[in-house]
Amino acid sequence: MDVSKVLILTLIWLLTADSAPPDYVTLTRKMESKILRVMGLSERPRPKPNATAPQYMWDLYRQQMAATEGAAASRGGETEIGKEEEEDGRPCSETKLSSNIIRSVSHTGGDLRASNSTSLQQILLFDVASIPHAETIEAADLRLEIPALPSATDVPSLAVRIYQLESRTRLNSIVSLKDKRLRLLDVVLADLSQGYAGTIDILSTVNSWRSKKTSNHGLLLHVELMSTSGNNRRGSQVIKELGAISKKCTANLIVTSSEYRQCSKRNRRNKRQAESEAPADISSFPTASLTNLCQRHRLFVSFRDVGWENWIIAPMGYQAYYCDGECPFPLGERLNGTNHAIIQTLVNSIDNRAVPKVCCAPTKLSGISMLYFDNNENVVLRQYEDMVVEACGCR
Protein backbone atom coordinates (compact mmCIF):
# COMPACT_ATOMS: atom_id res chain seq x y z
CA MET A 1 0.00 0.00 0.00
CA ASP A 2 1.22 3.49 -0.86
CA VAL A 3 2.75 5.35 2.09
CA SER A 4 0.36 8.29 1.76
CA LYS A 5 -2.72 6.03 1.83
CA VAL A 6 -1.42 4.18 4.88
CA LEU A 7 -0.66 7.46 6.62
CA ILE A 8 -4.13 8.90 5.96
CA LEU A 9 -5.85 5.72 7.21
CA THR A 10 -3.63 5.56 10.27
CA LEU A 11 -4.28 9.17 11.22
CA ILE A 12 -8.05 8.76 10.89
CA TRP A 13 -8.03 5.58 12.97
CA LEU A 14 -5.79 7.05 15.63
CA LEU A 15 -8.12 10.02 15.96
CA THR A 16 -10.98 7.68 16.91
CA ALA A 17 -9.04 4.99 18.79
CA ASP A 18 -9.68 6.25 22.34
CA SER A 19 -13.42 5.55 22.20
CA ALA A 20 -13.17 2.44 20.04
CA PRO A 21 -13.57 -1.27 20.96
CA PRO A 22 -10.40 -3.23 21.91
CA ASP A 23 -10.19 -4.98 18.52
CA TYR A 24 -10.37 -1.63 16.75
CA VAL A 25 -7.62 -0.22 18.96
CA THR A 26 -5.43 -3.23 18.16
CA LEU A 27 -5.98 -2.71 14.44
CA THR A 28 -5.15 0.97 14.86
CA ARG A 29 -1.86 0.20 16.54
CA LYS A 30 -0.99 -2.28 13.81
CA MET A 31 -1.66 0.37 11.18
CA GLU A 32 0.48 2.84 13.10
CA SER A 33 3.29 0.30 13.21
CA LYS A 34 2.95 -0.18 9.45
CA ILE A 35 3.19 3.50 8.61
CA LEU A 36 6.20 3.88 10.91
CA ARG A 37 7.95 1.04 9.07
CA VAL A 38 7.12 2.61 5.72
CA MET A 39 8.67 5.84 7.00
CA GLY A 40 11.80 3.88 7.93
CA LEU A 41 11.05 3.98 11.66
CA SER A 42 11.11 0.90 13.89
CA GLU A 43 8.87 2.56 16.49
CA ARG A 44 7.59 5.96 17.51
CA PRO A 45 10.66 8.19 17.75
CA ARG A 46 11.37 9.45 21.26
CA PRO A 47 13.72 12.42 20.92
CA LYS A 48 15.14 14.11 23.98
CA PRO A 49 12.86 16.78 25.46
CA ASN A 50 15.29 19.55 24.50
CA ALA A 51 15.99 18.24 20.99
CA THR A 52 15.61 20.87 18.29
CA ALA A 53 15.93 21.02 14.53
CA PRO A 54 18.93 22.93 13.12
CA GLN A 55 18.04 26.34 11.72
CA TYR A 56 19.28 25.14 8.34
CA MET A 57 16.60 22.42 8.27
CA TRP A 58 13.93 24.92 9.30
CA ASP A 59 15.02 27.16 6.43
CA LEU A 60 14.75 24.27 3.96
CA TYR A 61 11.31 23.36 5.29
CA ARG A 62 10.07 26.93 4.88
CA GLN A 63 11.50 27.05 1.35
CA GLN A 64 9.59 23.90 0.42
CA MET A 65 6.40 25.26 1.99
CA ALA A 66 6.77 28.53 0.08
CA ALA A 67 7.28 26.62 -3.18
CA THR A 68 4.19 24.50 -2.49
CA GLU A 69 2.06 27.54 -1.64
CA GLY A 70 3.32 29.32 -4.75
CA ALA A 71 2.33 26.36 -6.93
CA ALA A 72 -1.09 26.27 -5.28
CA ALA A 73 -1.56 30.00 -5.88
CA SER A 74 -0.74 29.57 -9.57
CA ARG A 75 -3.56 27.02 -9.79
CA GLY A 76 -5.97 29.34 -8.01
CA GLY A 77 -8.05 30.03 -11.10
CA GLU A 78 -8.85 26.37 -11.69
CA THR A 79 -11.99 24.72 -10.41
CA GLU A 80 -11.93 21.54 -8.37
CA ILE A 81 -13.73 19.73 -11.19
CA GLY A 82 -12.26 19.49 -14.67
CA LYS A 83 -8.49 19.57 -14.11
CA GLU A 84 -7.76 15.87 -13.93
CA GLU A 85 -4.94 14.08 -15.72
CA GLU A 86 -6.29 10.78 -16.94
CA GLU A 87 -4.08 7.75 -16.54
CA ASP A 88 -4.29 5.12 -19.22
CA GLY A 89 -2.55 2.51 -17.08
CA ARG A 90 0.25 1.70 -19.51
CA PRO A 91 3.62 1.30 -17.79
CA CYS A 92 6.41 3.59 -18.91
CA SER A 93 10.11 2.87 -18.97
CA GLU A 94 11.01 5.97 -17.00
CA THR A 95 10.88 6.35 -13.24
CA LYS A 96 9.60 9.33 -11.34
CA LEU A 97 10.68 10.79 -8.04
CA SER A 98 8.59 9.33 -5.25
CA SER A 99 9.97 11.51 -2.49
CA ASN A 100 12.77 13.88 -1.66
CA ILE A 101 14.39 13.15 1.69
CA ILE A 102 16.86 15.42 3.44
CA ARG A 103 18.48 14.23 6.67
CA SER A 104 20.54 16.18 9.15
CA VAL A 105 22.79 13.63 10.85
CA SER A 106 24.47 14.82 14.04
CA HIS A 107 28.01 13.66 14.77
CA THR A 108 28.85 11.48 17.75
CA GLY A 109 32.56 12.24 17.84
CA GLY A 110 34.76 14.20 20.20
CA ASP A 111 34.89 17.83 21.23
CA LEU A 112 36.54 20.70 19.40
CA ARG A 113 39.76 21.24 21.33
CA ALA A 114 43.10 22.99 20.88
CA SER A 115 45.80 20.96 19.16
CA ASN A 116 48.42 23.71 19.57
CA SER A 117 48.51 27.46 20.14
CA THR A 118 47.09 28.30 16.70
CA SER A 119 44.73 25.42 15.85
CA LEU A 120 41.84 23.28 17.03
CA GLN A 121 40.78 19.76 16.09
CA GLN A 122 37.70 17.60 16.28
CA ILE A 123 36.96 14.02 15.24
CA LEU A 124 33.52 13.69 13.64
CA LEU A 125 31.65 10.38 13.48
CA PHE A 126 28.44 9.94 11.48
CA ASP A 127 26.13 6.93 11.42
CA VAL A 128 25.25 6.49 7.75
CA ALA A 129 23.91 2.98 8.37
CA SER A 130 20.63 4.59 9.47
CA ILE A 131 19.93 5.62 5.86
CA PRO A 132 17.78 2.88 4.25
CA HIS A 133 19.46 1.09 1.35
CA ALA A 134 16.26 1.49 -0.66
CA GLU A 135 17.14 5.17 -0.97
CA THR A 136 19.55 6.55 -3.52
CA ILE A 137 21.86 9.20 -2.07
CA GLU A 138 21.90 12.20 -4.37
CA ALA A 139 24.11 14.51 -2.29
CA ALA A 140 26.05 14.45 0.97
CA ASP A 141 27.47 17.62 2.46
CA LEU A 142 29.26 18.42 5.67
CA ARG A 143 27.65 21.59 6.98
CA LEU A 144 29.91 23.61 9.26
CA GLU A 145 28.96 26.61 11.36
CA ILE A 146 31.60 28.59 13.25
CA PRO A 147 30.34 31.55 15.28
CA ALA A 148 31.76 35.01 14.67
CA LEU A 149 34.35 36.57 16.97
CA PRO A 150 33.80 40.32 16.45
CA SER A 151 37.03 41.04 18.36
CA ALA A 152 39.06 39.07 15.80
CA THR A 153 39.15 41.79 13.13
CA ASP A 154 42.91 42.14 13.60
CA VAL A 155 43.74 38.50 12.86
CA PRO A 156 44.02 36.70 9.51
CA SER A 157 41.61 34.10 8.18
CA LEU A 158 41.00 30.63 9.48
CA ALA A 159 41.97 27.65 7.35
CA VAL A 160 39.30 24.99 7.80
CA ARG A 161 40.50 21.57 6.63
CA ILE A 162 38.47 18.38 6.41
CA TYR A 163 40.26 15.02 6.34
CA GLN A 164 38.93 11.51 5.98
CA LEU A 165 40.29 9.17 8.65
CA GLU A 166 41.32 5.90 7.04
CA SER A 167 41.84 3.97 10.26
CA ARG A 168 40.46 3.95 13.77
CA THR A 169 41.44 6.89 15.97
CA ARG A 170 40.72 7.54 19.64
CA LEU A 171 38.23 10.32 20.28
CA ASN A 172 39.70 13.57 21.62
CA SER A 173 43.17 12.50 20.53
CA ILE A 174 45.44 14.99 18.75
CA VAL A 175 46.23 13.87 15.21
CA SER A 176 49.32 15.10 13.38
CA LEU A 177 48.56 16.45 9.92
CA LYS A 178 51.51 14.38 8.69
CA ASP A 179 49.71 11.21 9.76
CA LYS A 180 49.39 8.82 6.81
CA ARG A 181 45.90 7.85 7.98
CA LEU A 182 44.61 11.23 6.81
CA ARG A 183 43.23 12.01 3.36
CA LEU A 184 42.53 15.67 2.68
CA LEU A 185 39.02 16.21 1.30
CA ASP A 186 38.78 19.99 1.19
CA VAL A 187 40.02 23.25 2.66
CA VAL A 188 38.12 26.53 2.97
CA LEU A 189 39.09 29.94 4.33
CA ALA A 190 36.88 31.74 6.84
CA ASP A 191 36.87 35.27 8.23
CA LEU A 192 36.70 34.68 11.98
CA SER A 193 35.28 38.13 12.68
CA GLN A 194 32.33 37.28 10.39
CA GLY A 195 32.01 33.62 11.27
CA TYR A 196 31.53 30.80 8.79
CA ALA A 197 28.53 28.80 7.61
CA GLY A 198 28.92 26.59 4.57
CA THR A 199 28.94 23.09 3.15
CA ILE A 200 31.65 20.78 1.87
CA ASP A 201 30.81 18.03 -0.62
CA ILE A 202 31.69 14.60 0.81
CA LEU A 203 29.40 12.43 -1.34
CA SER A 204 32.13 10.04 -2.47
CA THR A 205 33.25 9.53 1.14
CA VAL A 206 29.72 8.79 2.35
CA ASN A 207 29.15 6.35 -0.51
CA SER A 208 32.36 4.53 0.39
CA TRP A 209 31.20 4.29 4.02
CA ARG A 210 27.86 2.99 2.88
CA SER A 211 29.30 0.32 0.61
CA LYS A 212 31.81 -0.80 3.23
CA LYS A 213 30.77 -0.14 6.82
CA THR A 214 34.18 -0.98 8.25
CA SER A 215 35.72 1.91 6.30
CA ASN A 216 33.78 4.52 8.30
CA HIS A 217 36.35 5.89 10.75
CA GLY A 218 34.99 9.41 10.61
CA LEU A 219 36.40 12.79 9.65
CA LEU A 220 38.95 15.11 11.16
CA LEU A 221 38.06 18.79 11.36
CA HIS A 222 41.19 20.93 11.65
CA VAL A 223 40.77 24.68 12.20
CA GLU A 224 43.99 26.69 12.03
CA LEU A 225 44.68 30.39 12.27
CA MET A 226 46.75 31.62 9.37
CA SER A 227 50.08 33.32 10.07
CA THR A 228 49.77 36.15 12.61
CA SER A 229 52.95 37.84 11.37
CA GLY A 230 54.91 36.97 14.47
CA ASN A 231 52.19 37.96 16.94
CA ASN A 232 51.86 34.47 18.41
CA ARG A 233 50.40 35.81 21.66
CA ARG A 234 47.43 37.35 19.83
CA GLY A 235 46.92 34.20 17.76
CA SER A 236 46.95 32.05 20.89
CA GLN A 237 44.43 34.36 22.54
CA VAL A 238 42.05 34.12 19.58
CA ILE A 239 42.25 30.32 19.56
CA LYS A 240 41.41 30.29 23.29
CA GLU A 241 38.42 32.55 22.65
CA LEU A 242 37.22 30.25 19.88
CA GLY A 243 37.76 27.22 22.10
CA ALA A 244 35.65 28.85 24.81
CA ILE A 245 32.65 28.96 22.47
CA SER A 246 33.39 25.63 20.79
CA LYS A 247 29.98 24.25 21.81
CA LYS A 248 28.46 26.72 19.38
CA CYS A 249 30.54 25.32 16.54
CA THR A 250 28.38 22.75 14.77
CA ALA A 251 29.07 20.06 12.21
CA ASN A 252 26.20 18.10 10.65
CA LEU A 253 26.04 15.69 7.76
CA ILE A 254 23.28 16.76 5.36
CA VAL A 255 22.22 13.84 3.17
CA THR A 256 19.77 14.25 0.30
CA SER A 257 18.31 10.96 -0.92
CA SER A 258 15.45 9.81 -3.12
CA GLU A 259 13.13 6.90 -3.64
CA TYR A 260 11.95 6.05 -7.13
CA ARG A 261 8.89 4.22 -8.37
CA GLN A 262 7.53 3.22 -11.75
CA CYS A 263 5.39 5.85 -13.39
CA SER A 264 2.53 5.65 -15.84
CA LYS A 265 2.03 7.66 -18.98
CA ARG A 266 -0.77 10.17 -18.64
CA ASN A 267 -2.98 11.74 -21.26
CA ARG A 268 -3.82 15.29 -20.31
CA ARG A 269 -7.36 16.44 -20.78
CA ASN A 270 -7.27 20.20 -20.61
CA LYS A 271 -9.77 22.30 -18.73
CA ARG A 272 -10.99 24.15 -21.83
CA GLN A 273 -11.88 20.92 -23.59
CA ALA A 274 -13.72 19.62 -20.51
CA GLU A 275 -15.69 22.83 -20.22
CA SER A 276 -16.64 22.83 -23.91
CA GLU A 277 -18.00 19.29 -23.62
CA ALA A 278 -19.86 20.00 -20.36
CA PRO A 279 -23.63 20.45 -20.25
CA ALA A 280 -24.66 24.08 -20.33
CA ASP A 281 -26.89 23.74 -17.27
CA ILE A 282 -25.51 21.55 -14.49
CA SER A 283 -28.68 22.09 -12.47
CA SER A 284 -30.51 19.86 -14.95
CA PHE A 285 -29.24 16.74 -13.18
CA PRO A 286 -32.42 14.98 -12.06
CA THR A 287 -31.16 12.88 -9.14
CA ALA A 288 -29.01 15.24 -7.10
CA SER A 289 -28.96 18.86 -6.06
CA LEU A 290 -25.88 20.98 -6.66
CA THR A 291 -24.89 20.74 -2.99
CA ASN A 292 -25.04 16.93 -3.09
CA LEU A 293 -22.90 16.52 -6.19
CA CYS A 294 -19.45 14.96 -5.96
CA GLN A 295 -17.12 17.62 -4.58
CA ARG A 296 -14.25 18.32 -2.18
CA HIS A 297 -14.84 18.81 1.55
CA ARG A 298 -12.55 20.03 4.33
CA LEU A 299 -10.73 17.53 6.57
CA PHE A 300 -8.07 18.82 8.97
CA VAL A 301 -5.62 16.22 10.30
CA SER A 302 -3.92 17.12 13.59
CA PHE A 303 -0.72 15.27 14.49
CA ARG A 304 -1.11 16.55 18.05
CA ASP A 305 -4.45 14.78 18.38
CA VAL A 306 -2.92 11.43 17.40
CA GLY A 307 -0.02 11.81 19.84
CA TRP A 308 2.73 12.41 17.29
CA GLU A 309 3.63 15.94 18.38
CA ASN A 310 6.75 14.75 20.27
CA TRP A 311 8.58 13.69 17.13
CA ILE A 312 6.89 15.55 14.28
CA ILE A 313 8.40 19.02 14.26
CA ALA A 314 6.29 20.59 11.51
CA PRO A 315 3.58 20.88 10.49
CA MET A 316 1.41 20.17 13.54
CA GLY A 317 -1.44 19.44 11.17
CA TYR A 318 -2.64 19.99 7.61
CA GLN A 319 -5.79 20.25 5.50
CA ALA A 320 -6.13 16.88 3.77
CA TYR A 321 -9.68 17.30 2.34
CA TYR A 322 -11.86 14.40 1.18
CA CYS A 323 -14.31 13.65 -1.63
CA ASP A 324 -18.00 13.01 -1.14
CA GLY A 325 -21.22 13.44 -3.08
CA GLU A 326 -23.42 11.87 -5.71
CA CYS A 327 -22.55 10.89 -9.26
CA PRO A 328 -25.97 11.06 -10.97
CA PHE A 329 -27.08 9.89 -14.38
CA PRO A 330 -26.36 11.32 -16.91
CA LEU A 331 -22.77 11.84 -15.83
CA GLY A 332 -21.69 15.24 -17.14
CA GLU A 333 -18.16 16.31 -17.94
CA ARG A 334 -18.15 18.72 -15.01
CA LEU A 335 -18.16 15.72 -12.71
CA ASN A 336 -14.82 14.76 -14.23
CA GLY A 337 -15.80 11.19 -14.99
CA THR A 338 -13.67 8.88 -17.06
CA ASN A 339 -15.08 7.22 -20.17
CA HIS A 340 -15.33 4.02 -18.15
CA ALA A 341 -17.28 5.82 -15.40
CA ILE A 342 -19.70 7.24 -17.98
CA ILE A 343 -20.33 3.76 -19.45
CA GLN A 344 -20.69 2.24 -15.96
CA THR A 345 -23.22 4.93 -14.99
CA LEU A 346 -25.20 4.24 -18.16
CA VAL A 347 -25.28 0.47 -17.50
CA ASN A 348 -26.24 1.06 -13.86
CA SER A 349 -29.14 3.28 -14.93
CA ILE A 350 -30.47 0.41 -17.08
CA ASP A 351 -29.89 -2.36 -14.53
CA ASN A 352 -28.61 -1.37 -11.09
CA ARG A 353 -28.00 -5.05 -10.28
CA ALA A 354 -25.52 -5.45 -13.10
CA VAL A 355 -22.89 -3.00 -11.87
CA PRO A 356 -22.65 -0.66 -8.86
CA LYS A 357 -22.81 3.11 -9.08
CA VAL A 358 -19.58 4.97 -9.69
CA CYS A 359 -18.01 6.62 -6.66
CA CYS A 360 -16.87 10.12 -5.82
CA ALA A 361 -13.11 9.88 -5.42
CA PRO A 362 -9.93 12.01 -5.59
CA THR A 363 -8.76 12.70 -9.13
CA LYS A 364 -5.87 15.00 -8.32
CA LEU A 365 -3.60 14.91 -5.28
CA SER A 366 -0.66 16.94 -4.05
CA GLY A 367 2.03 16.38 -1.44
CA ILE A 368 3.12 17.90 1.85
CA SER A 369 6.52 18.40 3.45
CA MET A 370 7.13 16.95 6.92
CA LEU A 371 9.96 17.78 9.30
CA TYR A 372 10.48 15.16 12.00
CA PHE A 373 12.92 13.19 14.17
CA ASP A 374 13.79 9.61 13.26
CA ASN A 375 14.75 6.83 15.68
CA ASN A 376 18.36 8.04 15.74
CA GLU A 377 17.36 11.63 16.56
CA ASN A 378 18.35 12.72 13.08
CA VAL A 379 16.18 15.50 11.71
CA VAL A 380 14.44 14.44 8.50
CA LEU A 381 12.74 16.65 5.93
CA ARG A 382 10.64 14.58 3.56
CA GLN A 383 8.12 15.27 0.84
CA TYR A 384 5.17 12.85 0.93
CA GLU A 385 3.18 12.75 -2.27
CA ASP A 386 -0.59 12.28 -2.66
CA MET A 387 -1.49 13.61 0.79
CA VAL A 388 -3.87 16.46 -0.12
CA VAL A 389 -6.97 16.16 -2.31
CA GLU A 390 -6.89 18.88 -4.96
CA ALA A 391 -9.86 17.73 -7.07
CA CYS A 392 -12.65 15.17 -7.03
CA GLY A 393 -14.48 13.26 -9.74
CA CYS A 394 -16.70 10.26 -10.41
CA ARG A 395 -14.82 7.01 -10.85
Curated annotation (Swiss-Prot):
Q: Name one Pfam family in it.
A: TGFb_propeptide
Keyword Nucleus among UniProt keywords: no
UniProt cross-references to Gene3D superfamilies, sorted A to Z: 2.60.120.970, Cystine-knot cytokines (2.10.90.10)
Signal peptide (UniProt feature, chain positions): 1-19
GO MF annotations, alphabetized:
cytokine activity; growth factor activity
Mind telling me which residues form the propeptide? 20-272
Disulfide links within the chain: C294-C360, C323-C392, C327-C394
List of glycosylated residues: N50, N116, N336
Which CDD domains does its entry note? TGF_beta_univin (cd19387)
- Segment Disordered: which positions? 69-97
What GO cellular component entries does it have? extracellular space
Instruction: Say if the entry is tagged with keyword Signal.
Output: yes
Cellular location(s): Secreted
Query: Where the protein is mainly located, per its record?
Result: secreted
Q: Which UniProt keywords apply?
A: Cleavage on pair of basic residues, Cytokine, Disulfide bond, Glycoprotein, Growth factor, Secreted, Signal
Q: How does it assemble?
A: Homodimer; disulfide-linked.
Function, as annotated, reads:
Could have a critical role in early developmental decisions in the sea urchin embryo.
Q: Belongs to which family?
A: Belongs to the TGF-beta family.
Q: Which PANTHER family match?
A: PROTEIN DECAPENTAPLEGIC (PTHR11848:SF263), TGF-BETA FAMILY (PTHR11848)
Identification of the protein by name: Univin
